[in-house]
Amino acid sequence: MRNKRIVIIGTRTWELTSIHMEYFVKNNANIVGILESPTEGITTTTSGGSSSKPINEVAEELNIPIICGKPKGEGVMDQVRAWKPDIVVVIGYQFFLPDEFLNIAPMGVVNFHTSLLPRHCGRHPGFWTIWYGDEQSGMCVHFMDSGLDTGEIAYKSYVPVENGDTVDTLYDRIWKNDEPIIKQLLDDIESDSVPRTPQDKSEYTYNYVPHESDFEFDFRQRAQLLVNRHLVKPNKSYIVLNGTQYPVAACTAIDEPTTSRNFKLNTPYNHKGNLVYMTPNQWLQVDELIVNDQPSAAFAIAQKELGEIATI
């Protein structure tokens, strides 16, 4: 067991918490207490299903004291102080930590954020990484300050973002690569030498909770990006035909069907009996739409809504 005293903050229903908690235990972290998030109102873009144990079960097995609450909840900060942590580690917690909380441990508070800060600060970073077509992602361990994911960076890991990724597959690739970071963090905690590099605030981008309107296909984006957006939340993306919103069940990026680009944006065309739209790179073929909760041929639906569709 290592010497430095660590308090872990996390959420029992989040894989981010359970997977990384397993790494901390495996690498002999001296965990003296756990603050667990209340689960009411917690949102996620992952599907769950981790084989790692939730933090409440780990706490019970290892006889680690655990409390559940928000940072300003009655007695929460007093209990964290009573554990006398050298450092606090956050691995999945949606509640803002006030300055009084950040100052409890002499070495401060570090947070595990699943994006390459300062890009994609805030919520659901994996979702937005895929949404914006980033080619690379990873884990960032940073010190927490009064801003939102704006504190000094300690470590980063890097993985590629692949076509066809979902939030689950991207996070799985990142998190499987995180044990070396945790071992390095624990080693540096022991020697009081956790590195601190200021973020470039000019590169800061903030995420928000996805809105229904975000899922309408924007044909100003390249076709493969639209396919990836569809895959990140299947059956949520949609097109509008004659004022009616149709969820997309299947779509494909296809090579240019013609040498001409004399076509209108946001306009459906008929290509060999398929419904297609021009994008800045390739064309998007919409194969199936959802009607009455069932996938149906997109071109037939478009014909019914629009009548004759121009052929390319």
At which residue positions do the language-model features occur?
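Short conserved beta-strand and strand-loop elements enriched in small hydrophobics
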Residues: 237-243
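One-carbon transfer enzymes
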Residues: 1-235, 271-273, 281-285, 290-312
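Short, isolated positions in well-ordered beta-strands
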Residues: 244-248, 284
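A short, sequence-level motif marking secondary-structure junctions
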Residues: 249-256, 288-294
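Low-complexity, glycine/alanine/valine/leucine- and proline-rich hydrophobic stretches
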Residues: 254-287
